[in-house]
UniProtKB/Swiss-Prot annotation:
Family annotation (PANTHER family): TRNA N6-ADENOSINE THREONYLCARBAMOYLTRANSFERASE, TRNA N6-ADENOSINE THREONYLCARBAMOYLTRANSFERASE, MITOCHONDRIAL
Family, as annotated: Belongs to the KAE1 / TsaD family.
Free-text function comment from the UniProt entry: Required for the formation of a threonylcarbamoyl group on adenosine at position 37 (t(6)A37) in tRNAs that read codons beginning with adenine. Is involved in the transfer of the threonylcarbamoyl moiety of threonylcarbamoyl-AMP (TC-AMP) to the N6 group of A37, together with TsaE and TsaB. TsaD likely plays a direct catalytic role in this reaction.
Record's protein name: tRNA N6-adenosine threonylcarbamoyltransferase
Top-rank taxon, per record: Bacteria
Keyword Cytoplasm included in the entry's annotation: yes
HAMAP family: TsaD
Catalyzed reactions per annotation: L-threonylcarbamoyladenylate + adenosine(37) in tRNA = N(6)-L-threonylcarbamoyladenosine(37) in tRNA + AMP + H(+)
Length: 334
């Protein structure tokens, strides 16, 4: 039995979890900063860092209390050390280093994107390797071939804006509240996704990259020409814009799956909480014999520490250890 306590502070959630054997979350505590950043319409890095300083130890204490496991029952401390906001990452890294030293436990640094890729192993039915992983968040839109824990190959990524960024910036153009992706998803449920024709957010050619800047620009031109609508017309606009983003994600993911002969697709990252993306990916998988799609519960799509504990557990089992010189790497590539 391997029990790992993990800390996640890469952006605006302060999170801590205790996970057993990389499969069972004994606790999973998340302190969100949505209310703090809402007035600014997005995450303010300095405010995020300051709030992490205040919240990190109370969140750790709560995670330990909920798990029923004390420091003596832990095998290691894992922490997100990149990528992310450097100030936010530093808070988590310093806390994890202090705890590992105080408790005499091994320390493991974890890539935040790997955490998303393995979050599905906390679900009731986990995927098997190999699988195609689509990580979609506010800062990342990437396709990975996952051949085993710690064994990933980047297949494609966004050339400009991430899908989550396209949602958030689109919502800001429409005067919707933060977080924008959630607001668009909610309104889109009442709208017609075919009401407005947006350009395909797909890079032409055989590669597996994405591009969302043109779609965002198309929304800007639409708003400049027609203004921001209200009522049903706003719902139609949200549904159409969302559909263009979702269509690009699903088409590229399944193109990669067919070309590279993957039978399993894992959706991960905050945008994987989008209801239309979840439905579209599930429906597309049903069209292909032998194709399965794995989507973690919504709470495991958004930033959390349980997924970091999963990745940290397997890094520990591979013999990986971080020393006292572990530092934040805001641009760490997986």
């Amino acid at each position: 039995m391997t029990r790992v306590l993990a800390i996640e502070t890469s952006c605006d959630e302060t999170a801590c979890a205790v996970v057993e054997d990389g499969r069972r979350a004994l606790s999973d505590v998340v302190s969100t900063q949505i209310d703090i950043h809402r007035r600014w319409g997005g995450v303010v890095p300095e405010l995020a860092s300051r709030n992490h300083v205040v919240q990190v130890m109370p969140v750790v204490d709560e995670a330990l209390a909920r798990s029923g496991v004390g420091p003596d029952g832990l095998d290691a401390v894992a922490v997100t050390s990149g990528p992310g906001l450097v100030g936010a990452l530093l808070v988590g890294v310093q806390a994890a280093k202090a705890l590992a030293l105080a408790w005499g436990k091994p320390l493991v640094g974890v890539n935040h994107l790997e955490g998303h890729l393995v979050a599905a192993f906390l679900a009731e039915v986990p995927p098997a390797f190999p699988y195609l992983g689509l990580v979609v968040s506010g800062g990342h839109t990437s396709l990975y071939a996952a051949h085993g824990f710690g064994d990933y190959r980047l297949l494609g990524q966004t050339r400009d804006d991430a899908a989550g960024e396209a949602f958030d910036k689109g919502a800001k153009l429409l005067g919707l509240p933060y977080p924008g992706g959630v607001a668009i998803d909610r309104l889109a449920k009442e709208g017609d996704p075919a009401a407005i024709r947006f350009p395909k957010a797909i890079v032409k050619g055989a590669d597996l990259d994405f591009s969302f800047s043109g779609l965002k620009t198309a929304l800007l031109h639409h708003v400049k020409k027609h203004g921001v609508p209200e009522g049903p017309a706003l719902a139609d606009l949200c549904a159409s814009y969302q559909e263009a983003i979702v269509r690009a994600l699903v088409e590229k993911a399944f193109r990669a799956a067919r070309r590279l002969q993957f039978e399993r697709l894992v959706l991960a990252g905050g945008v994987a909480a989008n209801s239309r993306l979840r439905a579209a990916a599930t429906a597309r998988a049903a069209e292909y014999e032998g194709m399965s799609v794995f989507i973690p519960p919504v709470r495991l799509c958004t930033d959390n520490a349980a997924m970091i504990a999963v990745a940290g557990t397997h890094a520990l089992l591979r013999g990986e250890r971080a020393g006292p010189d572990l530092n934040a790497d805001p641009a760490w590539r997986l």
